């Protein structure tokens, strides 16, 4: 969870500097949700810019634009979003009159000695061949989400999350990370003592056709904290965990199937 005392001290220490605060709305490892309303209020008290990474958050929840100045979205995490484009929602007053990277489609006119850029903010930051099909796919993915309805999604996710929590308690030698925090998405990261998460993921995929994620999930520094590792510590094997992400299209029967497969896999790999 966010250490708000530390955040307040950091903001206070840097109050005379330009502050750009970027936070993840939800952990892609443990599913822990950030209190974005409190973050936004605190950062803006110091006249800072608020940016949120909504990659893991956006498939399950919505956020009002009043709480951020910039929002980063990965549409491929939504149903139907595979191949969809990444999205940036940003306030116009944060956009300059020059592109971050000059490229085809951003320049209005160029000579040997000068150039002028387009005045359209979207065109300035979309140099090169536009990903039209990718953008259409992203749009359709959000239409599916909206048609299902956020209330229906959240209700189903709570049911699945609680059920999964109870089933986890039946597995011996299981280490669940951030286990005491309930304000989370139905994303779980755990290890089984004495068994490699990579071996478990391989067996679940090969024999039971269950796709999980083994490793550090692009969260190495956070992983060091979760696993109790020291910086620059020499390791004999690659550290990590097994991550399970539930979805509102799942049913309790899918969870039962997973735990049946997990139990059989543990027995097999323990010998």
Residue ranges and their predicted role:
Residues 1-271:
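Pyridoxal 5′-phosphate
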């Amino acid at each position: 969870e966010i250490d708000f005392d530390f955040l307040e001290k950091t903001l206070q220490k840097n109050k005379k500097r330009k502050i750009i605060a970027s936070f993840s709305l939800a952990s892609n490892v443990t599913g822990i949700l950030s209190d974005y309303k409190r973050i936004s209020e605190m950062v803006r008290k110091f006249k800072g810019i608020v940016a949120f990474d909504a990659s893991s958050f956006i498939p399950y929840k919505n956020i009002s634009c009043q709480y951020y100045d910039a929002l980063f979205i990965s549409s491929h995490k939504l149903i139907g979003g595979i191949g969809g484009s990444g999205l940036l929602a940003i306030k116009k007053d944060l956009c300059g009159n020059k592109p971050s990277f000059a490229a085809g489609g951003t320049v209005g006119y160029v000579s040997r000695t000068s150039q002028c850029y387009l005045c359209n903010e979207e065109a300035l930051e979309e140099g090169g061949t536009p990903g039209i099909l990718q953008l259409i796919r992203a749009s359709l993915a959000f239409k599916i989400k909206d048609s299902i309805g956020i209330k229906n999604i959240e209700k189903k996710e709570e049911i699945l999350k609680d059920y999964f929590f109870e089933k986890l308690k039946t597995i011996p030698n299981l280490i669940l990370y951030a286990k005491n925090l309930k304000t989370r998405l139905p994303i779980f990261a755990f290890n089984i003592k004495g068994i490699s998460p990579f071996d478990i993921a391989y067996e679940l995929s090969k024999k039971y056709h269950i796709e999980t994620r083994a490793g550090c999930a692009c969260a190495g520094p956070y992983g060091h904290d979760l696993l109790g590792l020291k910086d620059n510590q020499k390791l004999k094997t690659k550290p990590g965990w097994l991550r399970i992400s539930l979805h509102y299209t799942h049913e309790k029967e899918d969870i039962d199937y997973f735990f049946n497969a997990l139990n059989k896999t543990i027995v097999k790999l323990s010998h």
